[in-house]
Amino acid sequence: MVAVEFKVSESGRPRPEKNPKLGFFVYLLGSAAIIGGFLFGYDTSVVSAAMLYVPEAPGLKPMGTVWKEVIVSITPGMAAVGAWFSGAGSDRYGRKPIIIGSTLIFVCGAVICAVAWTKIVMLIGRIFLGVGIGFASMVVPVYLGEASPTHVRGTLVSAFAMMISFGQVVANIMGGVFSYWEPYTIGWRLMFAFAGIPALIQFVCFIFLPETPRWLYENGHTEQAEQVLEKIYGGNTEWIEYELAEIKTYAEERQKQMEEEKKSGPVIWRILKTPHVLKACFIGSMLQAFQQLAGINTILYYTADIIRSAGIENYHTIIWISVILSICNLIGPFAPMFFIEKLGRRKLFLFSCAGVVVSLVLIGVSFLLVGNDSAPNFDRSAYLLAGNYQSNGEAESCLMLSNCDSCVTSEHCGFCEDSETRTGFCLPVDHNDVTLYSSTGLCTNGLDKSNSSFPNATSYVWQKHHCTTSYTILPIVMMGVYLLTFSCGFTSLPWVLNSEFYPMWARSTCVSISTLSNWVFNLIIALTYLSLTHAITKYGAFWLYAIFTIIAFIFIYFLVPETTGYSIDEVEMLFMNKRQRNIAMQARQAKLDAASDKDKNSSTSLSTETITM
């Protein structure tokens, strides 16, 4: 099937040949808007570094696995809620008020997290940040699409996406910087507080920026819409008239759609009754779900925790390694920009998918090697000989674990290791200070850990989060490979394909449904990672993500069509059966014939006028 190239716009007016000059106003508008992407990336990633210190902060400890998962995952969970309601809110009140509201929510969330004195207060702050992210993720791209010059809209929307990755890099950098300033009492608070600065900058900028001309026009403010267009296009009359015609045509089409809805019911019911659109919506939603089931936000939200479990002890080193990994995630998306039109969506998606499967399998293998290489756990009889033994249920369950790696994976246990022989005991933690002491055995608080009565024992070191291993570098390198292969296709292609799959009347609703799918599975993955590692081990968790991605590969191979080079009408036909496609093609041909006859009549009329003159 050959793509149809349209020389004129939807309004029927030819697009001006010469692009307008970009003035200061456009640069200010674009720069202020994409700060929303930066805040999105920063506030979802800063938790990785901060959670090295928050669980041991005064007033917030002890913090078990469930609390850690909830504090991390509540933000994407509330982002789903914020994104769902922001669409209707921006249609009713305007894009600008919602963006200003999101900046204030970002500031409140940053301040609440920074001053949090209990786990509940921290949770409230993370809820605020999630709502702000939800608002920004939905409304800022719409604002950019409606308030920027036509020829740079794609660039600015892409810049918003890139700023998400840039925000993730900066979050790790600031985590590294602030980790040197009393991290357990002040440093982690500064990590959260820093996000308030760009949020305030965006707030101040948007006080002076206008509402989008499209929203103004659709809500009866025609004169104001023209004034905004004059600022955007620097007084270029040709472009202003063109854009006004586009907005008018869109408004008329939307009015027709609303009238159609009154006759046929809500769009969602029309989707359910239209098999090929329902099929496209299902495929689009599954692509968003698979993006999350591939484990990307496990890597991004728990970067520091994963690096620590690979055997890195120094927290500063952990955070700076996180910076390098986040840079991998930043540079990967440049690949689609160069190859997506040459290779096509399917090939690039399948390549990215295959790379993710291989890297997830290798991450799992790496952690299997780390586990097998970690210090063995002495049996119970050796523990009794060591002294300072108190028998209880927790101690018995910890002693049953095989080695250091399985021991530190449990939130109730830690490893008391002989620093010379790399052997030791898996002991229950001291809940007053889980990172420093065990509740019984040779690593209890106040006990001299030298014990000459125990063979080969000199000094015991308490390990709560990591084990000494020769394979530390392997999981870290494989995480870098994972981020590169994931970001070169899996990051952007679910969004690209969802923007192409649907007819105009169903696009907004179907994209909202698929976006909700993304956020819901984001929440599920973020909420279950730590519990999953306890239940099936770290390597088991990554192999499970690999299985999901293999299913995604099969799904894409058999069900996702190639959309490169096809028009919107042609893409819609790709989801139809043969009978539906024939009917659609006949209707489309009739429409093209009618348009051709209209053009001929216009040409004849023009020729007559020329002769008369």
From Swiss-Prot:
Provide the primary localization: membrane
One term of GO molecular function:
myo-inositol:proton symporter activity
Cited CDD domains: UDM1_RNF168_RNF169-like
* InterPro entries membership: MFS_dom, MFS_sugar_transport-like, MFS_trans_sf, Myo-inositol_Transporter, Sugar/inositol_transpt, Sugar_transporter_CS
Q: What is the lineage of its organism?
A: Eukaryota, Metazoa, Ecdysozoa, Nematoda, Chromadorea
**Entry-linked PANTHER family:** PROTON MYO-INOSITOL COTRANSPORTER, PROTON MYO-INOSITOL COTRANSPORTER HMIT-1.2
Q: Which reaction does it catalyse?
A: myo-inositol(out) + H(+)(out) = myo-inositol(in) + H(+)(in)
Q: How does it sit in the membrane?
A: Multi-pass membrane protein
Gene3D superfamilies tied to this protein: MFS general substrate transporter like domains
Query: Which region ranges are annotated with the description Disordered?
Result: 594-613
Q: Which residues lie on this side of the membrane: Extracellular?
A: 43-69, 118-119, 179-189, 301-317, 369-472, 537-539
Q: Which GO terms describe its cellular component?
A: apical plasma membrane; basal plasma membrane; perikaryon
- Please give the tissue specificity annotation from the record for this chain: Expressed in the excretory canal cell and in pairs of amphid and sheath glia.
- The transmembrane residues are 22-42, 70-90, 97-117, 120-140, 158-178, 190-210, 280-300, 318-338, 348-368, 473-493, 516-536, 540-560
The record's keywords, sorted A to Z, are:
Cell membrane, Glycoprotein, Membrane, Transmembrane, Transmembrane helix, Transport
Q: What is this protein called?
A: Proton myo-inositol cotransporter hmit-1.2
* Positions of glycan attachment: 372, 451, 456
Q: Where is the composition biased (Polar residues)?
A: 602-613
Stretches assigned to the Cytoplasmic side: 1-21, 91-96, 141-157, 211-279, 339-347, 494-515, 561-613
Source organism per entry reads Caenorhabditis elegans
